[in-house]
């Protein structure tokens, strides 16, 4: 069993099963179903036990366990960082807090429109819009060497309820972030972004293929089965000809 799944199982056993009936009183049917599912979710339970800010931490833990994208000494830009779960994982894996004196110390910078509570080992720009050129300049000023080795994006637009529109807006966010990689991402670097499967996914995949040596699609175990959520993992950044700044 993979390490992150062992962690989930152990955490689930520690917390055990609890009735959810009392918490569901006076709620609509849809609210009742959502709350019941949420409280029974092993990743929600594990996040609470392991002090992660939300269950999404296990998505990044799985990706990293399988593909080793984070290691001590790397500089990480976490886009859409609130509430900070991915930054927590990144801080641990790149040794940004310097807890392992025998390993290189990395750096984690999180950016979000929403407020993020402080986290030891991480620097946050918030509220800040990562698609705003002024934010890009601030990012460069904060990053050591004005470069990131890894760009993470768990960004998502506010849902409208119209699936195709939400998909198009998320793809647009990913493409906008990709457009600033020549200024920010170190050659040979890694780009991980969330999207919702749909008609524009191939457009994003083509762009990534033009700029990275390897591109793969990942559906982490912690992604809900009914969700169209997938992640593009692109490694070995080389950019399009003439776009990468050395």
Swiss-Prot record:
What tissues express this gene product? Widely expressed, with highest expression in muscle, placenta, and heart.
Entries under CDD domains matching the protein: AdoMet_MTases (cd02440)
Q: Which residues form the active site?
A: 194
Q: Where is the transit peptide?
A: 1-18
Q: What class of enzyme is it?
A: transferase
Keyword Lipoprotein, does the record have it?
Answer: no
Pfam (any one): FtsJ
What keyword terms does UniProt attach to this protein? Disease variant, Methyltransferase, Mitochondrion, Primary mitochondrial disease, rRNA processing, S-adenosyl-L-methionine, Transferase, Transit peptide
List the catalysed reactions.
Answer: uridine(1369) in 16S rRNA + S-adenosyl-L-methionine = 2'-O-methyluridine(1369) in 16S rRNA + S-adenosyl-L-homocysteine + H(+)
Coiled-coil regions in this chain?
A: none
Q: Name one GO cellular component term.
A: nucleolus
Write out the GO biological process terms. mitochondrial large ribosomal subunit assembly; RNA methylation; rRNA 2'-O-methylation; rRNA methylation; rRNA processing
Covalent S-S links between cysteines: none
Q: Which residues bind S-adenosyl-L-methionine?
A: 83-86, 112, 129-130, 154
The keyword Transport is assigned to this record: no
The UniProt entry, under InterPro entries, shows: RNA_methyltr_RlmE (IPR050082), RNA_MeTrfase_FtsJ_dom (IPR002877), rRNA-MeTfrase_E (IPR015507), SAM-dependent_MTases_sf (IPR029063)
Illness association: Mitochondrial DNA depletion syndrome 17: An autosomal recessive mitochondrial disorder characterized by childhood onset of rapidly progressive encephalopathy, stroke-like episodes, lactic acidosis, hypocitrullinemia, multiple defects of oxidative phosphorylation, mitochondrial complex I and IV deficiency, and reduced mtDNA copy number.
Q: Which HAMAP family does this entry report, sorted A to Z? A: RNA_methyltr_E
Instruction: Provide the function of this protein.
Output: S-adenosyl-L-methionine-dependent 2'-O-ribose methyltransferase that catalyzes the formation of 2'-O-methyluridine at position 1369 (Um1369) in the 16S mitochondrial large subunit ribosomal RNA (mtLSU rRNA), a universally conserved modification in the peptidyl transferase domain of the mtLSU rRNA. This activity may require prior 2'-O-methylguanosine modification at position 1370 (Gm1370) by MRM3. Essential for late-stage assembly of mtLSU required for efficient translation of mitochondrial DNA encoded proteins; methyltransferase activity is not required for this function.
Query: Which family is this protein grouped under?
Result: Belongs to the class I-like SAM-binding methyltransferase superfamily. RNA methyltransferase RlmE family.
Instruction: Provide the protein name.
Output: rRNA methyltransferase 2, mitochondrial
Which source organism does the UniProt entry give? Answer: Homo sapiens (Human)
| Gene (name only) | MRM2
